[in-house]
Swiss-Prot record:
Binds 1 zinc ion per subunit. One of its GO terms (molecular function) is structural constituent of ribosome. Zn(2+) binds at residues 7, 10, 33, 37. Part of the 50S ribosomal subunit. Forms a cluster with proteins L3 and L14. Its cofactor is Zn(2+). Belongs to the eukaryotic ribosomal protein eL24 family. The lineage of its organism: Archaea, Methanobacteriati, Methanobacteriota, Methanomada group, Methanococci. This is Large ribosomal subunit protein eL24. GO terms for biological process: translation.
């Protein structure tokens, strides 16, 4: 059974047979769900600052929970 992967940039799951696997010179394996994620990674963008990434949305939800509990 093929495995679901997680995008190395945005954090969303990648369906088997979709996306792109990139191996860097140092042997690090990166998975990207779209060319948008790959290009953003290559340009050095921070996924925590982009509203469309799951990483940003999860971080925002944690902050909201912390503020509500205070």
């Amino acid at each position: 059974m093929p495995e679901w992967r997680t995008c190395s940039f945005c954090g969303y799951e990648i369906e088997p047979g979709k996306g792109k696997m990139v191996v860097e010179k140092d042997g690090t394996v990166l998975y990207f769900c779209s060319s948008k994620c790959e290009k953003s990674y290559r340009m050095g963008r921070n996924p925590r600052k982009l509203k469309w990434t799951k990483v940003y949305q999860d971080m925002k939800a944690e902050l909201k929970k912390a503020q509500e509990s205070q």
